[in-house]
């Protein structure tokens, strides 16, 4: 809908709730007796969060930065026009990393690499009703069960 009507997007939680941290940052946290801030869930990264963090760190290194945060924001901003991620932070360094993302342009290869790390779950309701047929050129399962429609 946003693409169709030319609307902007303001995604939240693009940094995984602070759970996307490099190995170095996690070691530093452990050394200082800090876990990951969390209202619910474990104070350690899940396997998926570790994989994502490692991939973000690899791309960050290619851009000459240690900030997985900047890469995560740059990735989300690269996915569509007019994307304005909601970001936060508790420290000046967080703000600087958020700003750094504005100067990072990911290559198509880097985007493809990041997307290959774990399968993306679009979540409800899109996983129920399907993607925009004007883009995919195919009907969702729900639509296909009710009528034959051409999206050409």
Curated annotation (Swiss-Prot):
Alphabetical UniProt keywords: Oxidoreductase
UniProt-listed Pfam families: Aldo_ket_red (PF00248)
EC number: 1.1.1.-
InterPro entries from the UniProt entry: AKR_Detox_Biosynth (IPR050523), NADP_OxRdtase_dom (IPR023210), NADP_OxRdtase_dom_sf (IPR036812)
EC main group: oxidoreductase
Molecular function GO labels: oxidoreductase activity
Record SUPFAM superfamilies: NAD(P)-linked oxidoreductase (SSF51430)
PANTHER family: ARYL-ALCOHOL DEHYDROGENASE AAD10-RELATED, NADH-SPECIFIC METHYLGLYOXAL REDUCTASE-RELATED
Family stated for the protein in its record: Belongs to the aldo/keto reductase family. Aldo/keto reductase 2 subfamily.
Function: Putative aryl-alcohol dehydrogenase.
Name this polypeptide is given: Putative aryl-alcohol dehydrogenase YFL057C
Organism for this UniProt entry: Saccharomyces cerevisiae (strain ATCC 204508 / S288c)
């Amino acid at each position: 809908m946003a693409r169709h009507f030319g609307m902007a997007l303001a995604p939240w939680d693009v940094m995984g709730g602070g759970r996307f941290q490099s190995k170095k940052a996690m070691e530093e946290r452990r050394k200082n007796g800090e876990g990951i801030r969390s209202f619910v869930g474990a104070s350690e990264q899940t396997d998926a969060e570790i994989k994502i963090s490692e991939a973000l760190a690899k791309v960050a290194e290619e851009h000459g930065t240690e900030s997985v945060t900047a890469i995560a924001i740059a990735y989300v901003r690269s996915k569509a026009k007019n994307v304005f991620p909601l970001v936060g932070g508790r420290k000046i360094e967080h703000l600087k990393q958020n700003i750094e993302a504005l100067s990072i342009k990911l290559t198509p290869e880097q985007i493809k690499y990041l997307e290959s790390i774990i399968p993306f779950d679009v979540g409800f309701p899109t996983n129920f009703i399907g993607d925009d047929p004007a883009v995919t050129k195919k009907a969702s399962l729900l639509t296909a069960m009710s009528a034959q429609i051409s999206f050409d």
